[in-house]
Amino acid sequence: MLTSSVATISGNHIIAGNGVGGRNGFDGGPGQNGVTGSNGQPGQLSGPSGLGGVGGVLMCFGSSASGGAGGDGGDPGLAGQDGGSGFGPTPGAGGVGGAGGVSSPLPPGQDGASPLNGGSGVGGFSGADFGGFSFGRYTTADGGTGQLGQRGGGGGGAGGGGGLNAFLLTGGGNGGGGGGSGGCAGTGGGGGGGAGGSFGIVGVASTLTITGNTIETGNGGAGGAGGSGAPGGAGATGGLGATNDAPQVGAGGNGGAGGSGGAGGPGGGGGGGPTIGIAFHGGTVTESGNSFALGAAGVGGASPQGGNVGNTGRRTTVFSF
């Protein structure tokens, strides 16, 4: 490699070796499974109302995928409280509390809703057909890392049951179940490493006159394969609503299940190694009367299903980068 040089290269037989293959990318890590919501507490005739269950609590990379709290049972004659919505992308809505009244039977609280599962991460980009040069060395065209999937939303908390306020008979409603948390997303797979290339002559910011040479290049190395994205964690079930003395007092609804986390995206395949007779950046190259025998360009690295395969390396006699 010639840097900031003025040179004439003539009448030589130049033979370059083969490029080295790229490393394979790492596999992503699986997402954590969701946390189950807790059950609602019982209400009772001639007694107090039950508390709603707590939603499953889970943080994924600093963001909540927790389930919503279940609604408390209603005091005598009053409706149960509504359940809380879950947290996260597209969370499940909370259930409506059951109506209270002066006579039985009383309706149960509404179940909490379950959200959609988290989306999968986007695959990493393909390694290019050529990387570059830095400090006298070829820099490989690596594939990109797959993106993190989307966490699952938390399930909605269920509504609490209504309370009874009949003549000479009262009772508190049952608590609704808490929503299950969503699962955390899987992380993306690492990109495959770009392969080494084979170059006859390389000039950077140089003035070169290249005539009458025989220039043979070797084969470019094969790009490394992209790693697999990992699956997301499973969403957890919601807690059960209490049913004590139902339907004289309202039963609590069941908490919604959390959504599963999305899988991480696959890593992109590394770029195959180029095979180039004369490569230059900046400066000027005057080339004539040279004979070239180029090796095979390296194939791009594979990528798991849904990913981006690396590009085949560049194969050309003279290339300005």
Task: Give the positions of each predicted feature.
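Glycine-centric low-complexity repeats
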Residues: 1-321
